[in-house]
């Protein structure tokens, strides 16, 4: 039963993914305008792919779950969960535009100085944050400076909410399958450590131009269908 339970946006998506029995080709016809192109449509083979596509197009988000309502006809649990879902408060006070946020990420990239983290046998949020020496971070007047505290908050938020599909983020960020296999072998039963190590690899990969790390991370989160987390990161950085 779903009555009285608070449902997160991620939970709604998972219910849709697990419970959908409708033909994906039929669903693609329903969302043909939102998908926008034949090329994108050809890349959609599962309900999960469709959700990713809608999120990338900013047609589906934690603030707009209407597309999930349109596919919930044969899923009673999803219907109930949607009726109990409360969208988060929009702290910006106005609708969020994907392209405006990408420009914000570009502006943040110009302001940040990020040093690569050292490798740790057992990565943790605190260890990864401590890997950047204070002297490596300039004291910007802007609140968007990437301080140790904000870095810890970003890593903590992603490690807690990214979930078991973390390899998608790795692929979107250009991390090789072999590197991700190594992460799984090193931390076979520790999802949080897997994600933290992935973030560390993404950061290390940008050591030639550390300013690119945050922009690359935000873009990768968007590309892998986690616009909700990308927004969280940008909110952390904008305060």
Swiss-Prot record:
Pfam families from the UniProt entry? Death
**Chief localization:** cytoplasm
CDD domains listed in its UniProt record: Death
Enumerate the residue ranges of region (Death-inducing).
Answer: 1-105
User: Which positions fall inside the Death domain?
Assistant: 151-237
Q: Name one GO cellular component term.
A: cytosol
Q: Where are the transmembrane segments?
A: none
GO BP terms in the entry: apoptotic process; defense response to Gram-negative bacterium; extrinsic apoptotic signaling pathway; immune response; peptidoglycan recognition protein signaling pathway; positive regulation of antibacterial peptide biosynthetic process; positive regulation of defense response to virus by host; positive regulation of innate immune response
The consequence of residue 149 to Q is: In strain: G125
| SUPFAM superfamilies assigned to the protein according to its UniProt record, in alphabetical order | DEATH domain
The annotated subunit structure for this chain is: Interacts (via N-terminus) with Dredd; likely to bind Dredd simultaneously with Diap2 to form a trimeric complex. Interacts with imd.
Q: What is this protein called?
A: Fas-associated death domain protein
What's the stated role of this polypeptide?
Answer: Component of the IMD signaling pathway and is required for the host defense against Gram-negative bacteria. Interacts with Dredd, promotes cleavage of Dredd and is necessary and sufficient for enhancing Dredd-induced apoptosis.
> Which GO-annotated molecular functions does the record name?
CARD domain binding; caspase binding; death receptor binding
Q: In the UniProt annotation, what is the result of changing residue 71 to M?
A: In strain: G130 and G140
Effect on the protein of changing residue 143 to T? In strain: G02, G130 and G140
* Keywords associated with the record: Apoptosis, Cytoplasm
| Compartments in which it is found | Cytoplasm
The species is: Drosophila melanogaster (Fruit fly)
Top-level division of the source organism's lineage: Eukaryota
């Amino acid at each position: 039963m779903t009555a009285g339970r608070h449902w997160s946006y991620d939970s709604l998506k998972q219910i849709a993914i697990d419970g959908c029995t409708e033909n994906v080709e039929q669903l693609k016809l329903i969302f043909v305008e939102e998908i926008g192109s034949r090329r994108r449509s050809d890349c959609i083979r599962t309900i999960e792919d469709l959700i990713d596509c809608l999120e990338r197009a900013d047609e589906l988000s934690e603030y707009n779950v209407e597309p999930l309502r349109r596919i919930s006809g044969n899923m009673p649990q999803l219907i109930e969960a949607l009726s109990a879902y409360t969208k988060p408060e929009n702290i910006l006070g106005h609708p969020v535009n994907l392209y405006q946020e990408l420009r914000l990420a570009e502006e943040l990239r110009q302001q940040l100085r990020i040093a690569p983290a050292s490798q740790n046998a057992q990565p943790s949020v605190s260890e990864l944050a401590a890997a950047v020496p204070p002297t490596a971070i300039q004291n910007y007047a802007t609140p968007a400076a990437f301080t140790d505290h904000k870095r810890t908050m970003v890593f903590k938020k992603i490690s807690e909410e990214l979930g078991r599909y973390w390899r998608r983020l790795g692929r979107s960020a250009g991390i090789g399958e072999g590197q991700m296999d190594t992460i799984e072998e090193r931390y076979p039963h520790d999802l949080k450590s897997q994600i933290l190590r992935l973030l560390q690899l993404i950061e290390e990969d940008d050591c030639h131009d550390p300013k690119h790390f945050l922009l690359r991370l935000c873009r990768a989160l968007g590309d892998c269908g986690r616009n909700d987390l990308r927004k969280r990161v940008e909110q952390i950085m904008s305060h």
